[in-house]
């Protein structure tokens, strides 16, 4: 998606992500990734809503969201090992050593809503999982939230085979901070066209 700004008295456009183009490229290349700056016109002014960041985008054919979560888990482990090795070889560095997670837990959206309600949070099925409510159930470190409601998800996100109200999607969290998100993409043209019309 693009949004306009004025730059030297001319209209220019800043990109968010060429995700839909990358999805098309997977038909030829199977795996497509990009590391690039992204710009977002977020209306919120918090430390959780960055206007600019460096993004790692991955699109891959013939996989589902479980495969993508496993790939992210591998990337996190390799990254932490590399940083810890750097710290060991550079004791004056300002980095802090971090333990490598054995496995990154996966919690379903339904499970977390249930836990939040039991902890006294005012949340209903279909609501976003706000940081204040996540804090009430005491999750920390890395974890995935999976199987979000389909309703608010983009048109290209695949629904669950077992429940059409659920999406094959995830968010990667660290404590109450969202680091990444992803999903299984709809691969059938007719289904994708129908979803676009319904959205």
Task: List each language-model region with its residue ranges.
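A generic structural motif
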Residues: 57-68, 176-178
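Metal-assisted phosphate- and nucleotidyl-transfer catalytic regions
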Residues: 1-2, 72-176, 197-199
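Hydrophobic (often cysteine-bearing) scaffold residues that line and stabilize catalytic clefts
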Residues: 68-72, 188
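Active-site pocket scaffolds in enzymes
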Residues: 183-184, 188-199
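Conserved phosphate/anionic-ligand binding catalytic regions in large, soluble enzymes, centered on
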Residues: 26, 178-186
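Class II aminoacyl-tRNA synthetase-like tRNA-binding/catalytic domains
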Residues: 1-61
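Short loop/turn segments at secondary-structure transitions that flank enzyme active sites
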Residues: 9, 20, 41, 64, ...
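A residue-level signal for conserved active-site and pocket-lining positions in enzyme catalytic cores
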Residues: 14, 58, 112, 145, ...
């Amino acid at each position: 998606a693009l949004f306009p700004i004025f730059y030297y008295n001319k209209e220019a456009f800043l990109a968010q992500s060429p995700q839909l183009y990358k999805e098309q490229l997977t038909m030829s290349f199977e795996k497509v990734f990009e590391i690039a700056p992204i710009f977002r016109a977020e209306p919120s002014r918090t430390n959780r809503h960055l206007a600019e960041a460096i993004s790692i985008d991955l699109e891959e054919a013939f996989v589902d969201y479980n495969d993508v979560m496993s790939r992210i888990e591998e990337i996190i482990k390799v990254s932490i090992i590399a940083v810890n090795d750097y710290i060991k070889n550079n004791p004056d560095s300002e980095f802090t050593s971090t333990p490598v997670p054995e496995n990154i837990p996966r919690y379903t959206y339904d499970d977390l809503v249930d836990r939040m309600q039991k902890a006294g949070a005012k949340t209903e099925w279909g609501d976003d999982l706000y940081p204040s409510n996540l804090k009430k159930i005491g999750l920390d470190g890395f974890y995935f939230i999976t199987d979000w409601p389909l309703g608010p998800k983009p048109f290209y996100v695949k629904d669950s085979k077992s429940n059409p109200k659920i999406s094959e999607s995830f968010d990667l969290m660290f404590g109450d901070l969202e680091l990444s998100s992803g999903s299984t993409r709809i691969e059938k043209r007719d289904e994708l066209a129908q979803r676009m019309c319904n959205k």
